[in-house]
């Protein structure tokens, strides 16, 4: 089974998409999550929502910290990622900014092998995260601290390369568990792994993913940015209202066709996605407070300098968000 998970993961990496539509503005966009955030992005592509906004978007999967490197290099000048790398690169003089809050609640559960009955039993047992510095890493460390552990001292943390590889690591017994999100989370439950905690019960606010770009790109190409966020906003509505659209993306893009997994993903994720997708200040504050403990260079940075609400505010005030709320 671990080989199957890894093969599916590799297959997803290998499939960029180009909506080669005449008269559209070409742009490459990165997404760094094979979960609800990634599904929304594929809905925007497959349902023609980018094209509807005059964009010819090529979606490229870029994992973890590499997504920020791709953005800074200009390879993918806009994309979906977390707020953590925004703080880190801006501390060194960059101008990155989150302009759209896609997922504003923790979407992960800490899943463990069946022999682990309680969090007290985690001491000395390695757990996996996608990549160091990612949301899985920070959320796991914050959870361990709430349980009284010193991360890496009491509980080893291994970098696995993505969320599906965390499950693969549990299957191969390389690790005892780690944070998983849908649809991988549903598969883990089906296979008998234990849900130790829904992280949202420990950490209710957390800016998991959003649309990130550079202020220079906003100034240079405001219509691309505007069209991108409008497409993403409508894709969220489609995700919430059209189970078939979710099923299609999961089957054709993620190669997942298990009805139970698809249904749980479609029913669960909407509660993590705000109707008015501003980046979550409380969710960002939680992250910054945690980062400040170990990364002193980030302490002088303000939350306001890491976000730009103009495009969401424009959609809200124009009535666009109400217009698309029933989109299918």
Please describe what each predicted stretch is.
Residues 84-85, 164-255:
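Pocket-lining segment of extracytoplasmic ligand-binding domains
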């Amino acid at each position: 089974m671990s080989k199957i998970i890894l093969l599916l993961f590799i297959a997803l990496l290998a499939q960029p998409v180009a909506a080669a539509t005449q008269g559209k503005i070409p742009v490459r966009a990165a997404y760094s999550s094979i979960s609800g955030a990634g599904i929304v992005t594929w809905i925007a592509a497959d349902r023609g929502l980018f094209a509807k906004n005059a964009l010819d978007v090529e979606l490229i999967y870029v994992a973890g910290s590499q997504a920020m490197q791709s953005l800074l290099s200009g390879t993918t000048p806009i994309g979906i990622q977390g707020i953590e790398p925004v703080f880190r690169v801006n501390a060194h003089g960059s101008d990155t900014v989150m302009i759209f809050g896609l997922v504003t609640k923790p979407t992960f559960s800490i899943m463990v092998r069946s022999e682990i009955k309680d969090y007290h039993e985690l001491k000395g047992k390695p757990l996996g995260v996608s990549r160091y510095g990612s949301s899985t890493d920070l959320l796991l460390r914050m959870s361990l601290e709430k349980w009284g552990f010193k991360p890496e001292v009491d509980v080893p943390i291994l970098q696995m390369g993505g969320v599906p590889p965390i499950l693969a690591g549990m299957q191969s017994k390389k690790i005892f568990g780690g944070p998983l999100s849908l649809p991988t989370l549903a598969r883990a439950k089906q296979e008998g792994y234990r849900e130790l905690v829904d992280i949202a019960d420990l950490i209710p606010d957390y800016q998991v993913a959003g649309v990130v770009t550079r202020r220079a790109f906003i100034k240079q190409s405001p219509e691309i940015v505007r069209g991108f966020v409008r497409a993403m906003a409508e894709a969220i509505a489609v995700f919430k209202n059209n189970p078939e659209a979710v099923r299609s993306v999961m089957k054709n893009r993620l190669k997942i066709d298990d009805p139970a997994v698809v249904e749980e993903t479609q029913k669960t994720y909407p509660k993590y996605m705000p109707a008015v997708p501003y980046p979550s200040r409380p969710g960002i504050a939680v992250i910054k407070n945690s980062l400040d403990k170990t990364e002193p260079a980030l302490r002088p940075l303000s939350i306001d300098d890491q976000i730009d609400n103009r495009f969401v505010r424009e959609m809200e005030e124009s009535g666009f968000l109400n217009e698309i709320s029933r989109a299918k």
